[in-house]
């Protein structure tokens, strides 16, 4: 598919009903692994016993950046064997706008992402830039654990 065909298709989806991903379980092991990689071992994230005693949440809380790092997986954008549009050379995470964490994400929770395309435009280098509104929901919790505008770019082999 050409960049122009993808642009036309994406423009028709701007503002459409949000897509909803599948549920994903957030284990303490995943949180601990993220703490190891980022060198952020604050007790509120990794100390199960202490959080049970001293935290207002009663359980470890995942790092906000942990939640952000899961957005490509939660939105299904990381599927190299199933490209959204044939002809894409690569997809780039270009950044995030307006990130907030309205509710803590506790170890043992299940989350999923709601994604709505907000805008799409052409960019140099045979690419398209998209902005998606992303809301990460926690099962059984009214407030989301994360809301953000995700900026990504698609670059095509040819036009």
Regions found by a protein language model. Name each.
Residues 1-15, 19, 101-159:
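HotDog/MaoC-like acyl-thioester-processing domains
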Residues 2-93, 159:
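Hot-dog-fold acyl-thioester-processing enzymes
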Residues 94-98:
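A beta-strand/beta-hairpin structural motif
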């Amino acid at each position: 598919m050409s960049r122009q065909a993808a642009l036309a298709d994406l423009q028709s989806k701007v503002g459409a009903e949000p897509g909803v991903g599948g549920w994903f379980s957030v284990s303490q092991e995943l949180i601990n692994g993220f703490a190891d990689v980022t060198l952020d071992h604050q007790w509120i994230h990794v100390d199960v016993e202490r959080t049970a005693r001293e935290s207002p949440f009663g359980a470890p809380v995942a790092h906000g950046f942990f939640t952000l790092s899961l957005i490509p997986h939660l939105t299904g954008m990381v599927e190299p064997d199933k490209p959204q549009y044939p002809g894409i050379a690569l997809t780039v995470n270009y950044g995030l706008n307006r990130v907030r964490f309205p509710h803590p994400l506790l170890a043992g929770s299940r989350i999923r992402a709601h994604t709505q395309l907000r805008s799409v435009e052409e960019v140099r280098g045979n690419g398209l830039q998209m902005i998606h509104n992303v809301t990460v929901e926690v099962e059984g919790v009214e407030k989301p654990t994360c809301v953000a505008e995700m900026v990504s770019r698609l670059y095509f082999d040819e036009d």
